[in-house]
UniProtKB/Swiss-Prot annotation:
Protein name: Cytokinin dehydrogenase 1
Catalytic reaction equation(s): N(6)-dimethylallyladenine + A + H2O = 3-methyl-2-butenal + adenine + AH2
Biological source species: Zea mays
Signal sequence segment: 1-18
InterPro entries named in the record: Cytok_DH_C_sf (IPR016170), Cytokinin_DH_FAD/cytokin-bd (IPR015345), FAD-bd_PCMH (IPR016166), FAD-bd_PCMH-like_sf (IPR036318), FAD-bd_PCMH_sub1 (IPR016167), FAD-bd_PCMH_sub2 (IPR016169), FAD-linked_Oxase-like_C (IPR016164), FAD-linked_Oxidoreductases_BP (IPR050432)
Length: 534
């Protein structure tokens, strides 16, 4: 969850207008002539080379690195994408790599195309009428353009009484972007990541061919693209499984000062039921967890937007009484419909769940909210941070999958070790996932154990010159894991060394990844910002 430059010689403005009109331009600022086939493309959209367009495509949410492209394509149809990629394949010596930018939410330039062509996918949705989101007549799935954002998929689905089963925490990401990574949130323990909930896709490969794929049709492309980091093609349509949408969510948080109790309860809430065939779970619809380091405990508790001032004061006092350097909180929901009887049943079911947990007595908190409001909860934080000028700051995030057998070691070494005594701005999230709900044939890489933890250290650099400290802190965390022999997998990361990518995927999956690259993007055109093949 989708989960992102130019120049000219003399006559920049005139050449830019010429390209937009589809007539030949002189070339780029490196002295490379525009291929005749590019200059002659009959595009419905616009290919822009002006500084406004290229500068906007040279940065991302991470706000750590930047790279100017040579041009930005604003497509008006999927035909524009086919035309661009077909020209790239048919032109000898084509010098431009191609990246597909959704909402620019990559962290380290993964959606950049330095000196190449960035495709602004949002333009595809802007040009579409009606919008490229359609719920099936039987309510079994929703078809969504790869450029569509999940908040719009939610709204269109709710209008028909249904909703996708698996989400991201933040809904203003594109369908194609998150499916190119995995797409995880607190529903993934029971439904798998978003990539496990895709029924069919339309993909334009690196050859410029539009291919419909599924588990039954062109299955190798289907599996490769899901979690494939944009290396094999661009998703222009995804068919996503949906379910009847609940109306409300009972939103609860339980507080712990003991990591063993915290993690055991998380696993209890997310474990498949015995005899359920691996697909039957307890009543909770969503389960995540948060870690609060004592140095910034009060601020971070308040920043959740969940706890009242009185709640924060009580939790801070609890930490003091127990001399706790870290506090943990399970966050969960139990979804239900609007009927009074359903609300009463939720009360009863929640009481039953509470009786099985080992949180600190008296430290269970709950709220009742609309289902859509819960799913869109992070957007309110975005609005608030934007007003304070704290949203568009560097985000040196570190996202990992840690095997269950080593999560206690991670807690001791990182939460109770490296992060102690540091200033932390941003949430620390940790929750278990079931490997059985992932399809290992897809490109996404996960640890080998049956249960592993998603760990998201979502740091923001808000103090002057703090970015370098946070980046070094991330390196210390990774060094600790390496030295401790923790077989983690990074998520949403960019490696710059081929051996790191081989380690990330594992030998067998890496060999398959290379095979699919050779088949579907042999010229190594796509998504150069991932630094896998470029």
């Amino acid at each position: 969850m989708a989960v992102v430059y130019y120049l000219l010689l003399a006559g920049l403005i005139a050449c830019s207008h010429a390209l937009a009109a589809g007539t030949p331009a002189l070339g780029d600022d490196r002295g490379r002539p525009w291929p005749a086939s590019l200059a002659a493309l009959a595009l419905d959209g616009k290919l822009r080379t002006d500084s406004n367009a290229t500068a906007a495509a040279s940065t991302d949410f991470g706000n750590i690195t930047s790279a100017l492209p040579a041009a930005v394509l604003y497509p008006s149809s999927t035909g524009d994408l086919v035309a661009l990629l077909s020209a790239a394949n048919s032109t000898p010596g084509w010098p431009y790599t191609i990246a597909f930018r959704g909402r620019g939410h990559s962290l380290m330039g993964q959606a950049f195309a330095p000196g190449g062509v960035v495709v602004n996918m949002a333009s595809l949705g802007d040009a579409a009428a009606p919008p490229r989101i359609n719920v099936s007549a039987d309510g079994r799935y929703v078809d969504a353009g790869g450029e569509q954002v999940w908040i719009d998929v939610l709204r269109a689905s709710l209008a028909r009484g249904v909703a996708p089963r698996s989400w991201n925490d933040y809904l203003y990401l594109t369908v194609g972007g998150t499916l190119s990574n995995a797409g995880i949130s607190g529903q993934a323990f029971r439904h798998g990541p978003q990539i496990s909930n895709v029924l069919e896709m339309d993909v334009i490969t690196g050859h410029g061919e539009m291919v419909t794929c599924s588990k039954q049709l062109n299955a190798d492309l289907f599996d490769a693209v899901l979690g494939g980091l944009g290396q094999f093609g661009v998703i222009t349509r995804a068919r996503i499984a949906v379910e009847p949408a609940p109306a409300r969510a009972r939103w609860v948080r339980f507080v712990y000062t003991d990591f063993a109790a915290f993690s055991a309860d998380q696993e209890r809430l997310t474990a498949p039921r015995p005899g359920g065939g691996g697909a039957s779970f307890g009543p909770m619809s969503y389960v995540e967890g948060s870690v609060f380091v004592n140095q910034s405990l009060a601020t971070d508790l308040a920043n959740t937007g969940f706890f009242t001032d009185a709640d924060v004061a009580r939790i801070v006092a609890l930490a003091g009484e127990r001399n706790a350097t870290t506090v943990y909180s399970i966050e969960a929901t139990l979804n239900y419909d609007n009927a009074t009887a359903a609300a009463a049943a939720v009360d009863q079911e929640l009481a039953s769940v509470l009786g099985t947990l080992s949180y600190v007595e008296g430290f269970a908190f709950q709220r009742d909210v609309a289902y859509a409001a819960f799913l869109d909860r992070v957007h309110g934080e975005e609005v608030a941070l934007n007003k304070l000028g704290l949203w568009r700051v560097p985000h040196p995030w570190l996202n990992m999958f840690v095997p269950r057998s080593r999560i206690a070691d991670f807690d001791r070494g990182v939460f109770k070790g490296i992060l102690q005594g540091t200033d932390i701005v941003g949430p620390l999230i940790v929750y278990p996932l079931n490997k059985s709900m992932w399809d290992d044939g897809m490109s996404a890489a996960t640890p080998s154990e049956d249960v592993f933890y998603a760990v998201s250290l979502l740091f923001s650099s808000v103090a002057p010159n703090d970015l370098a400290r946070l980046q070094e802190q991330n390196r210390r965390i990774l060094r600790f894991c390496d030295l401790a022999g923790i077989q983690y997998k990074t998520y949403l990361a960019r490696h710059t060394d081929r051996s790191d990518w081989v380690r990330h995927f594992g030998a067998a999956k890496w060999n398959r990844f290379v095979e699919m690259k050779n088949k579907y993007d042999p010229k190594r055109l796509l998504s150069p910002g991932q630094d896998i093949f470029n």
